[in-house]
Amino acid sequence: MRVKPDLSFRRLWDISFGFFGVQIAYALQSANISRIFATLGADPHNLSYFWILPPLAGIIVQPIVGALSDRTWNRFGRRIPYLIAGSAIAVAVMCLLPNAASFKGYIHAMWFGLIALMMLDTFINMAMQPFKMLVGDMVNERQKGLAYSIQSFLSNAGSLVGYLFPILFTYIGISNIAAPGVIPDSVIFSFYGGAAILILCTLYSSIRVKEMPPAEFRKFHQISDKELTEKNNFISLLRHAPKVFWTVGLVQFFCWSAFMYMWTYSTGAIADNVWHSTDPAFPTNQPGTGRAYYSPYKP
């Protein structure tokens, strides 16, 4: 098996740069969705019901995208087509979701918001996974630690920017207060800004990154033509998964259980316990919550 050549730091950066935009989108979703549904009239105690569809969609969509991209070879690459498609649809949904209040009637707004949330989570995941796969495809074993460190840095930087967006827009004078049932401009503009950055970051990585052609990929990964076209079902893959897969999977299971509680309830819980209000229209509610989250990051 041939050893993949070392890549320059710039090349490693380019492979993962789109991750910055993806994580901004994820942060906007996780920080603001509960607020959006509460603004539309959802009971704060029932917010978890709205968060059920995204992970259900992810359970179905992510394995399908992974399996399809493993067998996709065209002039645009192997992973890049899914990255572009996922980002493009996620951007469209990000522009539509904060306008759910435009629908007349509580039921219509809720259904639109619910479907938009499911699509947003699904296609953000579709845009995110190819970046992880690109590292495995293109980076040699010696540099993978550096490549994933760059990806982790961009991930955390994007999350921080996404979480702070509504605060920054409020700081420059965009209203964080709106009439009952109306989503504030600070949240709407945050989603617009996140959508713009997501598509720009994705285009940058898509243009800068050139994936290996199939023949070269097979040489570097010691894959035969038969193995490349061989189909393994989900049960077979689980049966032959290494021990580390199950170890990491168990840890991830409990981590993501905690994340879901945090994303669903922490905004309302902090607002209720600190400012004694869960009303989304309360003037100091949401920006104060954001400052409480990120006060450790501020000088």
Where are these regions (language model features)?
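Helix-loop boundary and gating motifs at the non-cytosolic
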Residues: 1-57, 246-251, 255-283
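Intracellular loop-helix junctions on the cytosolic face of multi-pass helical membrane proteins
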Residues: 1-10, 101, 106-115, 126-127, ...
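Transmembrane alpha-helical cores of Major Facilitator Superfamily
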Residues: 20, 49-56, 118, 149-157, ...
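Intracellular helix-loop hinge segments at the cytoplasmic ends of transmembrane helices
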Residues: 35, 132-138, 268
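Short helix-loop-helix connector
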Residues: 41-42, 69, 73, 123, ...
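Juxtamembrane helix-start elements in MFS-like secondary transporters
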Residues: 43-51, 79, 109, 113, ...
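Central cavity-lining transmembrane alpha-helices of secondary-active solute carriers
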Residues: 47-72, 85-94, 157-163, 299
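C-terminal ends and interior cores of transmembrane alpha-helices
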Residues: 81-107
